[in-house]
Structure formats: structure tokens, C-alpha cells
């Protein structure tokens, strides 16, 4: 959409930005009803589908695509490349760090999400990490909480995030900086 010129392009972006301004809690009831109508409550599919689209991701990747020099896109068009080929061979390599950054940020957000998964799941086998930690915390009751175990569980829960960041650190920093790959 960034490189295509069509009528209503600005209006489409405005609609996307308005949806980004909606509080997440305002979407809980409509999303719950949609998942219930499709029998996706308390399923992994419901958890995945409900978090698969991100308005923040659309905005982040749009901004990254806007950093790609239009001369490179025009050169690919002159060479006869299709829109998909331009995306695959020109735009994606130049914005790879933004994709990795978005993937890492999405994983962290989903990993830490507590409210939405607790609304659509009631089976402890399908709990997300934050729900599992809370149930582990609640099991001890008000006076029987084993704080050493809760803190150990919290430390273990952070390990996958640290590993992912360690592997993606180079691209994460580049994605935030907005490197376009053009010198001069």
C-alpha cells in the first residue's frame, strides 16, 4: 500500500490509525462474541487467531517501508518486477530488521498478555505463561504462598525472552534505528 497510488489511500491509513487509538479493552466483548460464534473459545486456534493481526505492526512496517528509497522500487518496476517480487527482493531485505523487531515485540506482548487469554480460556492446559504464574501464586493462598518458588518461577519465565533477545539483538537495534541500506 505504501508504494501503490490509489484513491482513498489516506482515508484507509486514517481508519487504521483510528483503530490503533481504540483501547484494547474496548475490543474484548466483540472479539469474544466472534470467537464464541465460531466455537474458538478455549482453543489454541482462538488464541492464535485473536492475536494474529496487530495495528501496531501495520504502522511499524508501513513506516519501515516508507524508508525504502522510491528509486529502488521504481528501478525494479522498470525491470518488470511484479509487486510481490518487489516486496520479496527489494523491500523485505531492506526492512528485515523491522520484521524481526516486530516479531520480537509481538512475542513479548503475547507472552506477557494476561487479561485476554484468561477471558477466552478456562482449561489449565491452555493457560499462557502469565496465567500459569498467577495460578501458581494463588495456590498457596494468602498465608501459604511459597515466595521463593514464585520468584524462581518468575526467573525461569524470563529465560525464553532473554534467549530470543540475545539472538535477535542485532536486528532489533537496527529495526529501531531504521537502517535503509542506502549510503550517502
Residue ranges: model-predicted function:
Residues 2-184:
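A structural signal for multi-pass alpha-helical bundles of membrane permease subunits
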